[in-house]
Amino acid sequence: MALELNIEADRYHEVVALSASTAKHLLRSPAHYLMSKAEQTDPSLPMRFGTLVHALVLEPHTVSSKFAVEPGLPSRKTKAGREMAAEFEAAHPGKMVFDLETFQRAQRTADAVMSNKLARDYFTGPGVVTEATAYWTETVNNSLVPHKARLDCWNERLGMVVDLKTAQDSSPEGFAAAVRTYKYALQAAHYPRALEMVAGIKDVRFLFVAVEGEPPHGVGVYELDAETVEVARQQMRRAADLFVRAHHPSASAADLGYAQEIVQLKIGA
């Protein structure tokens, strides 16, 4: 096995397997995980913006084929603006459409990343592959569990996986809060495991490059502490157990939701 390249994001997301993203839903409950699979929602504006920034930094050669920039159109708040926007989108099927102002802001965000000496070294140069995909299986409770991961950047030269995040606040305090809120630590546990399983590479470092989508587009580079990553590994193992439960043919709705018992909550000050 090895990392696979040139796999489109849509094809990757269609594969049913345990990933850092699906683990977030599973850790809430298997029922929430199954609902997330059944009800695919359109990406939010921040998610779309993040996708564009990723392409500008990691795959600039794909931008023209995947994105389109609207010419100056009337406001979408007007009927004429909505109609003209709909016509433009229909003329660019399969592309993510942005207004010029948003596209330029994304370009400035990407430029800020590449102006950071550390980030530029991580994302460019020999031994760098971007948007690489890994598939593998592991045995959990006597069941084979499919796993998958999509790495923003694997820098073989430096022996590290680097994940690019757009953030509201990329200061140490602000990004630490985002790590807690969005469970980013699961990636720090899951992605190095992917390289170990598909390529036999151990002791891989995992870093985040966080960039603010608004001026002045601050950039921070972060590595999680060992204790946080170990907790995330335990959570991924628990998510694998829950994945097996979610896909068990005899599982009922009552088995997959929250515990049907009184749970004591301890609330800190």
Regions found by a protein language model. Give the residues of each.
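Short acidic (Asp/Glu) and glycine-rich catalytic loops that position anionic groups and cofactors
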Residues: 30-35, 166-171, 213-218
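Metal-dependent nuclease catalytic regions and adjoining charged, substrate-binding loops involved
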Residues: 178-185, 190-269
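Conserved catalytic cores of phosphodiester-cleaving nucleases, focusing on short active-site segments
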Residues: 130, 149-177
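Secondary-structure boundary elements
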Residues: 119-124, 155-161, 196-204
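Metal-dependent nuclease catalytic cores that hydrolyze phosphodiester bonds in DNA/RNA
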Residues: 1-148, 257-258, 262
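Hydrophobic/aromatic-lined pockets within catalytic cores
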Residues: 57-62, 166-169, 196-200, 244
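Short histidine-centered catalytic/ligand-binding loop motif
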Residues: 40-42, 91-98, 172-183, 225-227
